[in-house]
Amino acid sequence: MQPELLLFDIGNTSIKIGLAHERQVVTSYTLRTDAGQTADDLGLKLATLLGHAGVTPQSLRACVASSVVPGFDPLLREAVARYVDCPLYRVGADLSVPLENRYERPAEVGADRLVGAYAARRLYPEFPGLLVVDFGTAVTIDCVNGNAYMGGLIFPGPRTALSALSREAAKLPRVNLDVRADEPTPGRSTATSIQHGLVFGFACMVEGLAQRLKRQLPGPARVLGTGGFAASIARVSPVFDHVLPALLLEGLRRLYYEERTAF
């Protein structure tokens, strides 16, 4: 089947772009979030991605976007209008997520968190309790109980923590976070000490928080990992029942087809 949807998961640091049809997300790309670029800059990048995927703008039925960067929205609207020329539907403004939002002030919840929770619920309807752990600029752990979004936790992501460490501590370097060890070992270099401290530290933090949050959900609850660092955590920890890199794109895809009768 030919892709007919162009999906945008717009985060603070990066934009995940997906192409999808009624059955699945076919492929995805990642761009850096740059609110300083022009609509033409973004539009030409989109045209290049579509060309690489062998998809023509005329074959697209709609664009669907989730954004946590309000300043990027006008840029996206103009780029889509000029280079894709199909309707753009935004979560929150044009599409409502069909979950009961238990936040004290529901409008405060990031669209990405709601879409991730919705995707988890649709993928795993047999489990009443779900935890969605999304690694981005921030890590979010969101709780789903039945059809209710219960809220969750937010804390700095691994790369955000690394940036703060190297910025605030003059003698500590920036390092990559590619760890091959199965267990933390006493670092015999500063780089190894930082790598193991951050990777295993975040693994233990997610394990502990997931264990405590699961006690508040009907069991057996499932823990889903997504975002750029989830695979790294999964290599050193059994905390995730499933790692789903395209979870938010899958949520956008399902949301469009579930809600399109309202268009």
From Swiss-Prot:
GO terms for biological process: coenzyme A biosynthetic process. Substrate binds at Y103, G110, A111, D112, R113, T190. GO terms for molecular function: ATP binding; metal ion binding; pantothenate kinase activity. Coiled coil: none annotated. It catalyses: (R)-pantothenate + ATP = (R)-4'-phosphopantothenate + ADP + H(+). It comes from the Bacteria. This is Type III pantothenate kinase. It is found in: Cytoplasm. CDD domains: ASKHA_NBD_PanK-III (cd24015). Pathway: Cofactor biosynthesis; coenzyme A biosynthesis; CoA from (R)-pantothenate: step 1/5. Catalyzes the phosphorylation of pantothenate (Pan), the first step in CoA biosynthesis. Its cofactor is NH4(+); K(+). ATP binds at D9, I10, G11, N12, T13, S14, I15, K16, T137. It comes from Desulfovibrio desulfuricans (strain ATCC 27774 / DSM 6949 / MB). SUPFAM superfamilies: Actin-like ATPase domain (SSF53067). The active site is at D112 (proton acceptor). Homodimer. Its main location: cytoplasm. It is an enzyme of class 2 (transferase). Belongs to the type III pantothenate kinase family. Keywords: ATP-binding, Coenzyme A biosynthesis, Cytoplasm, Kinase, Metal-binding, Nucleotide-binding, Potassium, Transferase. A monovalent cation. Ammonium or potassium. One of its GO terms (cellular component) is cytoplasm. K(+) binds at D134. Its EC number is 2.7.1.33.
